[in-house]
Amino acid sequence: MSLTYLNIMLAFSTSLLGLLMYRSHLMSSLLCLEGLVLSLFVLTTLMVLTINLTLTNLLPIILLVFAACEAALGLSLLVVVSNTYGVDYVQNLNLLKC
């Protein structure tokens, strides 16, 4: 395993550990999720470049589309929670249920 793959795996595990540890604020959870998606994007891009298979060329682009949708939904949820309650605690998400 090369040093590049090891660094990407370290970034993924650090983001996952941050997501598990800092669950109180929604903004920190969203930042950790973005770190996870960014490391997955770099890993899939490197894998596609090494495999050279034509069927997998669109995989990083599809992952970026899902990451953009995830970021947009997360930011809109952050705006709704902060406008409604004034804080961005994750425990306030239970209060948004109908």
Swiss-Prot record:
Cellular compartments annotated: Mitochondrion inner membrane
Top enzyme category: translocase
Reaction(s) the record says it catalyses: a ubiquinone + NADH + 5 H(+)(in) = a ubiquinol + NAD(+) + 4 H(+)(out)
Keyword Repeat: no
GO MF: NADH dehydrogenase (ubiquinone) activity
Main location: mitochondrion
Family annotation (InterPro entries): NADH_UbQ_OxRdtase_chain4L/K, NUOK/Mnh_C1-like
GO cellular component, one term: respiratory chain complex I
Keywords: Electron transport, Membrane, Mitochondrion, Mitochondrion inner membrane, NAD, Respiratory chain, Translocase, Transmembrane, Transmembrane helix, Transport, Ubiquinone
Bilayer-crossing regions: 1-21, 31-51, 61-81
Top-rank lineage group of the source organism: Eukaryota
GO terms (BP aspect): ATP synthesis coupled electron transport
Membrane topology: Multi-pass membrane protein
EC identifiers of the protein: 7.1.1.2
Subunit structure as annotated in this protein's UniProt entry: Core subunit of respiratory chain NADH dehydrogenase (Complex I) which is composed of 45 different subunits.
Record function comment: Core subunit of the mitochondrial membrane respiratory chain NADH dehydrogenase (Complex I) which catalyzes electron transfer from NADH through the respiratory chain, using ubiquinone as an electron acceptor. Part of the enzyme membrane arm which is embedded in the lipid bilayer and involved in proton translocation.
Stated family: Belongs to the complex I subunit 4L family.
Protein known as: NADH-ubiquinone oxidoreductase chain 4L
Species this chain originates from: Chalinolobus tuberculatus (New Zealand long-tailed bat)
Name of the gene this protein is made from: MT-ND4L
